[in-house]
Amino acid sequence: MQITIKDLQDLLSSVQRKKIQTLKLKKNKFELILNKPSKKVPQEVVSLKSSHIFKSIHSETINIPPKKTESINSKPSTNYATIVSPMVGTFYHSPAPGEKIFVQVGDIVKCNQTVCIIEAMKLMNEIEAEIEGIIIEILVKNGDIVDCGQALMKVET
């Protein structure tokens, strides 16, 4: 008996619907191993770098109007980057109440420098800058609830 694409599609569909975490299928020279990621949160998380968070990208067609051309006398454009939250949680600007805040407007940040903490499920996750630059705006207040992907700070690069 040959395994067809249809058989594989049916199998993958069943695995998605059921509570199957691991599946190993071996037939002659064909071998398939499926491992679903666990939905459990690791208990020993201390620091989470936002560079390790991946977002799914949906393909869409977007019509973007052409940019207006700038005159020669206009100011050169400034580059900005945004530090975003890699998770849902509570934003804190200092390691503990009453302690010195990590960064404030006007501070120069370096790559991998801790800029804030996001508390998620009673775990304090240090959020680090992925770029160097000057903090020009902090977009959330201490104690605010933030969503995954929400902008936290604006950095001039």
Swiss-Prot record:
Top-rank taxon: Eukaryota
Keywords in alphabetical order: Biotin, Chloroplast, Fatty acid biosynthesis, Fatty acid metabolism, Lipid biosynthesis, Lipid metabolism, Plastid
Residues bearing PTM N6-biotinyllysine: K122
Pathway annotation from the record: Lipid metabolism; fatty acid biosynthesis
One GO cellular component, as annotated: acetyl-CoA carboxylase complex
NADP is among the record's keywords: no
Domain Biotinyl-binding positions: 80-156
Keyword Aminoacyl-tRNA synthetase: no
Subcellular compartments: Plastid, Chloroplast
GO molecular function list: acetyl-CoA carboxylase activity
GO biological process: fatty acid biosynthetic process
Known function: This protein is a component of the acetyl coenzyme A carboxylase complex; first, biotin carboxylase catalyzes the carboxylation of the carrier protein and then the transcarboxylase transfers the carboxyl group to form malonyl-CoA.
PANTHER family: OXALOACETATE DECARBOXYLASE ALPHA CHAIN
Protein name, per record: Biotin carboxyl carrier protein of acetyl-CoA carboxylase
